[in-house]
Amino acid sequence: MTIANLIDHTALKPHTQKSEIKKLIEEAKAYQFASVCVNPTWVEFAAEELKGTEIDVCTVIGFPLGANTTETKAFETKDAIAKGATEVDMVINIAALKDGNDDFVEADIRAVVEAAKGKALVKVIIETCLLTDEEKERACRLAVAAGADFVKTSTGFSTGGATAEDIALMRKTVGPDIGVKASGGIRTKEDVETMISNGATRIGASAGVSIVSGAEGKNEDNY
């Protein structure tokens, strides 16, 4: 297992063009990243390009705000899987969590887990930069209760990204059997090593190539 094998090689900007997605895929093949993480519109293309490889196709659900209806998130999940996605990163309903509506948050996550039906890993983005520590812990517990495979720090589209402290808190909360994905602002090999040492088992980054090559990450994206 190498650092590259832990990275979801990511391109989620709304103006990302086909040539850039093609480059992302070729880089994933060259460096053997865990997955490519793309917007839903690119899932079918990525799945076709990655056919015959062990690289997963990851996409995002209810992204980046998490404010879609539960029914929409479930449909997005089924549609993405039908088009070739093998991993989905969903955003929780952040407002519901802050309102203390835990039953709704858990049901929202569970709907995506059930829509995936063992065909795709489900990673739950809790958007740590918007939460108190108590809310982070509660979100993690709800994700575990709903049957998610991973908890994830950030979308990369809000006010902050992954921190070592948040990764450690999330790992402590979910225990050893659930994955923890760090994303948002990870640009160097040292960043990755810090996240892993605090409990991360997957890294989301658009600077994957510079991370594994040891070059200084110059990508200005937040994910």
From Swiss-Prot:
GO terms for cellular component: cytoplasm. This is Deoxyribose-phosphate aldolase 2. One of its GO terms (biological process) is carbohydrate catabolic process. CDD domains: DeoC (cd00959). The keyword Cytoplasm applies. PANTHER family: DEOXYRIBOSE-PHOSPHATE ALDOLASE (PTHR10889:SF1). Coiled coil: none annotated. Its main location: cytoplasm. The keyword Lyase applies. Keywords: Cytoplasm, Lyase, Schiff base. Belongs to the DeoC/FbaB aldolase family. DeoC type 1 subfamily. InterPro entries: Aldolase_TIM, DeoC, DeoC/FbaB/LacD_aldolase, DeoC_typeI. Disulfide bonds: none annotated. One of its GO terms (molecular function) is deoxyribose-phosphate aldolase activity. Pathway: Carbohydrate degradation; 2-deoxy-D-ribose 1-phosphate degradation; D-glyceraldehyde 3-phosphate and acetaldehyde from 2-deoxy-alpha-D-ribose 1-phosphate: step 2/2. It comes from Bacillus licheniformis (strain ATCC 14580 / DSM 13 / JCM 2505 / CCUG 7422 / NBRC 12200 / NCIMB 9375 / NCTC 10341 / NRRL NRS-1264 / Gibson 46). The active site is at D89, K152, K181. Catalyzes a reversible aldol reaction between acetaldehyde and D-glyceraldehyde 3-phosphate to generate 2-deoxy-D-ribose 5-phosphate. The gene is deoC2. Its EC number is 4.1.2.4. It catalyses: 2-deoxy-D-ribose 5-phosphate = D-glyceraldehyde 3-phosphate + acetaldehyde.
